[in-house]
Amino acid sequence: MATEKPHINLAVIGHIDHGKSTTVGRLMYEAGAVPAHIIEQYKKEAESKGKGSFAFAWVMDNLKEERERGITIDIAHKRFDTDKYYFTVVDCPGHRDFVKNMITGASQADAAVIVVAAPDGVMEQTKEHVFLSKTLGIKQLIVAVNKMDAANYDEARFNQVKSDVGALLKMVGTNPDTVKFIPISAFEGDNITKNSDKMPWYKGKTLFGLLDELEVPDKPTEKPLRVPIQDAYSISGIGTVPVGRVETGILKKGMNVTFMPANKSGEVKSIEMHHEEIPQAVPGDNIGFNVRGIGKDDVRRGDVCGASDNPPAVAEEFTAQIVVLQHPSAITVGYTPVFHCHTAQTACTFTELVKKLDPRTGQTLEENPTFLKAGDAAIIKCHPTKPLCLENAKEFPQLGRFAIRDMGQTIAAGMCINVVKKQMR
């Protein structure tokens, strides 16, 4: 197994045309993860379609439909190595209706690179991306100000974008001084692996240098096992193979596991990562595994796998702390939007507005408010309309954070602070 280096999941986030996929393609290419002849082939193909600059982006957008439309749709997992780490890139789509993909992508990330184009600067979506990165608990951020070639490598422009993004970070309670900013051109390759002579005014490290400064998150191996399922495949000769990322605990061959809320159990026969069989999987590993006694219809996206003697909680109702990002009118009791939590998407009804909080300090402003509007923070109670695995965010951050979506937009984001468990036995 070639995993001696520590592993980091990296989300690359950005507005639709800000060069996110090109940045990822360039990283992969410079790290030697993409053979030069493939890039050449993509280049020719891209030029013949009049999209010459998309060559690196095509490394990521390897889905036919995406190529035609020039947008990243599903989350692509790619691997590349730096001197110090090996990275799995979660390329998060930037289109508006893909924010929910981004939520499930970003919630798997240990660190994020937010790509902002120098000529355009901060866009509406950039705000949402910064906010979601915060809500989804991504502590380490690098802001790559891309397309510097299109801004004449101008230092003043870089500083302007830096201060605009800095203002956004402050809004969500992140100190901009803890975030690394770097001017790049993914297309030209400036400041990716070597410092660009076109921007002598930038004295910092290259993008690869900054990636090597990231810290590997502590692996919560001592916690109970939790694996949110992204998909379940039927593979001939093997059977059903659920796929997901281990969030906490250790998954071992021979273990008895239970999938919730499906309430189906079986024994782990084999575990695979990056197409190689492994004896056990630890937090951060994106894996496929085969379970004896589990059929194709027993497991679906949104289920969570745990040890049979300590299965994931299924929420009868839950209390959450949320921040309302946007809503055309007011949110009242009875509102039933879709909650995107780990890989699940489930409609939940607001059953009680417990209190309104000051978003900056967390102090209570009002008990039992009659409604909530954009900008409010609150404690609420909710009831899932169908079984949903949800855990207290203090114990299992990855299974307790969520985004709330309705009408094609992210309405709110938050975390679960208490779960009333459903009896499943």
Curated annotation (Swiss-Prot):
Region of interest (G2), ranges: 70-74
Organism of this sequence: Methanospirillum hungatei JF-1 (strain ATCC 27890 / DSM 864 / NBRC 100397 / JF-1)
Region (G4): 146-149
Record-annotated tr-type G domain positions: 5-221
The EC number(s) this enzyme carries: 3.6.5.3
Molecular function via GO: GTP binding; GTPase activity; translation elongation factor activity
Keywords, comma-separated and alphabetical: Cytoplasm, Elongation factor, GTP-binding, Hydrolase, Magnesium, Metal-binding, Nucleotide-binding, Protein biosynthesis
Binding-site positions, Mg(2+): 21
Region (G5) location: 185-187
Main localisation: cytoplasm
Protein name as catalogued: Elongation factor 1-alpha
Catalyzed reaction equations: GTP + H2O = GDP + phosphate + H(+)
UniProt signal peptide: none
CDD domains: EF1_alpha, EF1_alpha_II, EF1_alpha_III
UniProt function note: GTP hydrolase that promotes the GTP-dependent binding of aminoacyl-tRNA to the A-site of ribosomes during protein biosynthesis.
A Gene Ontology term for the protein's cellular component: cytoplasm
SUPFAM superfamilies associated with the record: EF-Tu/eEF-1alpha/eIF2-gamma C-terminal domain, P-loop containing nucleoside triphosphate hydrolases, Translation proteins
Record-linked Pfam families: GTP-eEF1A_C, GTP_EFTU, GTP_EFTU_D2
Class of the enzyme per the UniProt entry, highest EC level: hydrolase
Locations listed in the record: Cytoplasm
Start and end residues of each stretch annotated as G3: 91-94
Transmembrane regions listed in the UniProt entry: none
Database matches in InterPro entries: EFTu-like_2, G_TR_CS, GTP-eEF1A_C, P-loop_NTPase, Small_GTP-bd, T_Tr_GTP-bd_dom, TRAFAC_GTPase_members, Transl_B-barrel_sf
